[in-house]
């Protein structure tokens, strides 16, 4: 079976050309990687191991009812995390095995609803995590 990703420059995806459509998200995540609420809004998205780039997070951030976002083993880095600020319902994010550093944690600090953050292994430091925890009291950070 082959998938053609509309709006992507290559079959590998992750080019930042997602277009923001649900079809693109569904093709990337697959049926098991997406959960919706009773109004059809995406609340859970698992894109772990997929060809997701920083620019793709702008499309993901349009889904403001998102509560859980799994981006482990993707091409996401610090710049992409700036797009996540509109996700005021986001509770859990996994950024394990990504290029995230302390600079990216500053963007996550703006997502006040976060309760669990998975960052192992990444390039974050103890100091960066301490700063994040100070900005988000009660957040659990695993790194």
Locations of the language-model features?
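Post-signal peptide N-terminal segment of mature Sec-exported envelope proteins
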Residues: 16-41
